[in-house]
Structure formats: structure tokens, C-alpha cells
Amino acid sequence: MKKILWRPLCFFIAALSACNTAQKNTEPKQLTTDGYTNGAASADGIGKFYMGREISFVMGAAGSEWLERDTRNEEENTALAVQNLPLQQNSVVADIGAGTGYYSFRIAQRIPRGKLYAVEIQEEMISQLYHRKKELKDAVVTIVQGTEQAPNLPDNSTDLALMVDVYHELAYPREMLQAIYKALKPGGKIVLLEYRGEDPSVPIKPLHKTTVAQLNRELEANGFKLSYKADFLPIQHFLLYEKK
């Protein structure tokens, strides 16, 4: 097995963060509604907290090359992640925060009679998705422009919603989860891939990692229950939630 070199990964995450690397845990101070609080922002956060977790900055279009880096499968075993998604050939999947479509177009190969909604809010990423769809002559992926609070999907339309290193960046996690809940069919599922916050050896900034305990609190508060947890990926949790 090749030894994975994390230095490029660490450098990129650091470059996207604020220059102040002395990050402190900042307690939220001003209470708002629906589980949100406001407080002083840390180096990588927006100063908005959900159920005690500070929300991180969003990776912008500047991160496109990193999302498509040649070493990504070696570092994260993305092929194994796609292989383990609970899919049928006719499944309807929503890739929330699809970015460049790295996962979207790989998943599309597993659902030739299904549909994949590639949901994005950033115009630059949406342009890249359309370019890639045309380049690949793809007939499965449908590109959807979402908002910060909703994926803009039809109610009861989707079997599986996927978020890959996206959930911790959602500015409105409560609203997004509730919108996804409506979009999922009865028995629908969410899969979250998130960098493991419990593991200090994972070379990612703290706000870009999450713990299972924290994710469970947030998902359960919005109508989901954890049905499968696995750590077969090198640095990410693989968590499957079902509608209650």
C-alpha cells in the first residue's frame, strides 16, 4: 500500500482558511431561534452556530482543482464510497453541494435507468457541471440550482440524498435538512461523508471535521435516525440516516 502524502491536502485547507491559524473554540453568545446562536467567529468559521457547532466557511470555486486532484481517490478512496452507496439501477439520487460533479458523474454510472440531481448554489460550479455533462454526453444527471436553505427538488422525488464534505458548511442546516426530508420518498435516506472530528490525526482544520455524536444530534432533531455507520474510508465517516 502506498503511503499517502497529506501535505498538499493540509496546505490547501489551510490556504482556504483565514491567515490566523491560532484557532480557538468560541462559545456562542447571542441566542437566536431554531437551535442557532451567534458568537465571535473563529478563524475558519462564520460566527453562526447550530446546536453548539460553529458553521465553517464555504469552499468556493477556487477549490475546483482540489476537488478534481489526481490523488483524491488515493487519499479518500472515493471509489469505495461510491461502491457502498445503497443504490439500484433506477434510483433517484440528489448530490447536494455537487461542486464540480466529481461524485455526481461517477454515481450516474451506477444508476443508468435512474436520475441524479446535481444540486449547487454557486454559479461557477454550475457552469462547470453543465460543461462536464456536455463533455461526457451524460443523460442521467440533471443540474439544479439550489439555495442556502433548500435543494429545490420536488417533494417525494428522491431515494437518496448525498452530501460529501458539505454538511458542515451549510449556512442553514436546519432548513436544508427539513427541505431534504420533504424531497425524500418514504423510506428515503441521507448519506453524509464528513471528515472525522474525533480523530486528531486527520489533517483537516477543526471546523471542516465533524463528530458522529454532533451529527446525530442535528439529524435526529430534524426527523432522521442513524441506521448505518462505518469507518472504512481513510479519513471520513460514512453515515447513513433514514427518515423516522
Segment roles from a protein language model:
Residues 151-160:
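A short acidic, Gly/Pro-enriched loop at the edge of an enzyme's catalytic core
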Residues 89-99:
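Conserved class I S-adenosyl-L-methionine
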Residues 25-86, 92:
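Class I SAM-dependent transferase core
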Residues 100-112:
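Conserved SAM-binding loop of SAM-dependent methyltransferases across substrates and taxa
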Residues 136-148:
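Conserved SAM-binding strand-loop segment of SAM-dependent methyltransferases
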Residues 122-123:
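Conserved SAM/SAH-binding beta-strand->alpha-helix loop
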Residues 222, 227-244:
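Core SAM-dependent methyltransferase catalytic element
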Residues 174-189:
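A short glycine-rich, Lys/Arg-flanked "PGG" loop and its adjoining helix->strand segment in the class I
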